[in-house]
Each structure stands twice: as C-alpha cells, then as structure tokens.
C-alpha cells in the first residue's frame, strides 16, 4: 500500500544521503590544475573545451564510430528502462500488462538486486570473449526482451512471465552499460579522460530524447504500448549493424599515435 511506497522512497533517500556523506567527509578536495582564464566563466570555458575535444575526435575515427553505435543502442536501453514501469502498469486494453503497484515495486527491487550479479557476469564474459563481443551478445538479449514484451505477457501467467523478463533485463542492464564505458576508456588518449568522458556524457544526453519520441509516436499511431515497445528494436538492430565494424585494435593504435 501507500506505506510500502513511502518506505521505499525513504530508503532510497537514506541510501543517497549515506553515500553523499561519505563523499563530503572522505573525498579530498583537489584544486584546478589550470586557473580560469581572464574574462572566462566556467560555462564558457567548458563549452570551448568541449569544442576542442570534438575537433580532436577526427584523429580517432574508430572511437567516433563506436560512439555512434553506443548512442544508438544506449538510447534503446535507456528508453526500455524508462518506459517499462508505464508499460507494466498500463491496462491490457492499452497494450500494457496491468500489474498491481505492489507487484511492480517487487519487480523493480528484484531487478536492482539481480543487476549486481549481472554486472559481475558480464565482467567475466568480457575477459573471456572481449568487451565488444560481450556488448553484441547483450544487444541480442535486449532485442529479444522487446520482442517478447510485444508478443507475450498476455495470459494468466503474465505476472510470472514479467518477473522472468525482469531477470533478463537485470542481467544485461548493468553489464552492457559498464562494459560500454570500459571499452570507451580503451579508445581515448591517456591524460584526457575527463575531456573525452565529458564529450561522451554531453553527446549521450543530447540524443536521449529520441527513444521516448519514437516510443510515443508508435504508441500514438498504433494505439498500443506494445508497438511503442517493439519500435525500440530499431536502436538495438542499428547498434548491431554499426558495432561489428568498430576496429578496437585500430582505435587503440590511434590513441598511442596521438598521445
């Protein structure tokens, strides 16, 4: 009921407060290596540095290719995560599953727990077959998730099926994103990690609206959330098309050449 929701929200707040307190008390303050130029603000200096990083990217074509693949499939991942609760709670007549709030909360909590072990699994898999191949495997699973969400979850067993689907989401959710970041780290120059990761984050946020837009348009056109979910397979297919063409070894060689 309402008390369970209140406890859930309070526990999340205490979690963030606890780790924020550790940051405030334990993290050593470091002063800027370079002082802010005269007449500049932190905002203007940041945008100039972002532009400089963008111009430098021409020296790393494989990294750019990887970023394109990442932006595509990550938009799909983020949108699935964002709309899954809406899809699960919506009534069957709208193409949803019709889950009760208590059941939905239980699935969400289960996903957070299983995702931890999923991240460990993908870390081991990446050591075995490589980071890029691990991401490709995860994208096939993500594609399978949206296909099953579209075609399944309709009968009397839909609650149990959604729990099982949640396990698959949890397994690939943390792992695919963590491996993506670690692979990007191998494709950028040493000593410029902050610059390139800033570009990585800004570019990611700049395209994050496309997934919800596609989902919403498909839902409006076809009148069912299931078509909205199915439309997200575009991002995973696009990622699967681009990612195999990324030459990780050449990207690392480019980094050595321009470091």
Describe the role of every protein-language-model region.
Residues 82-103:
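Short amphipathic helix-loop junctions that connect adjacent transmembrane helices
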Residues 101-102, 190-200:
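Loop-to-transmembrane helix entry/capping segments in MFS-fold secondary transporters
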Residues 117-131, 219:
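Helix-to-loop junctions at the C-terminal end of transmembrane segments
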Residues 140-156:
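C-terminal ends and interior cores of transmembrane alpha-helices
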Residues 158-175:
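Hydrophobic core of transmembrane alpha-helices in multi-pass small-molecule transporters
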């Amino acid at each position: 009921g309402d008390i369970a929701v209140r406890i859930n929200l309070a526990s999340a707040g205490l979690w963030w407060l606890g780790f924020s307190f550790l940051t405030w008390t334990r993290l050593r303050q470091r002063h800027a290596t370079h002082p802010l130029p005269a007449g500049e603000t932190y905002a203007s200096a940041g945008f100039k540095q972002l532009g400089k990083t963008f111009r430098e990217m021409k020296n790393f074509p494989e990294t750019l290719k990887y970023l394109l693949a990442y932006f595509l499939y990550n938009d799909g991942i983020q949108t699935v995560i964002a709309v899954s609760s809406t899809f699960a709670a919506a009534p069957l007549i709208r193409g949803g599953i019709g889950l009760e709030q208590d059941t939905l909360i239980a699935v969400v909590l289960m996903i957070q727990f299983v995702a931890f072990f999923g991240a460990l699994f993908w870390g081991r898999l990446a050591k075995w077959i490589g980071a890029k191949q691990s991401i490709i495997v995860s994208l096939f699973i993500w594609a399978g998730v949206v296909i099953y969400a579209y075609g399944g979850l309709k009968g009397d067993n839909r609650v149990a099926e959604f729990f099982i689907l949640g396990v698959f989401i949890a397994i690939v959710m943390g792992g695919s994103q963590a491996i993506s970041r670690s692979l990007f780290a191998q494709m950028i120059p040493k000593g410029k990690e902050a610059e390139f990761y800033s570009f990585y984050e800004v570019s990611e946020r700049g395209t994050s609206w496309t997934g919800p837009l596609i989902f919403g348009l498909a839902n409006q056109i076809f009148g069912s959330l299931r078509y909205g979910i199915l439309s997200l397979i575009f991002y995973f297919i696009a990622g699967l098309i681009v990612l195999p063409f990324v030459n990780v070894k050449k990207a690392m060689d480019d980094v050595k050449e321009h470091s």
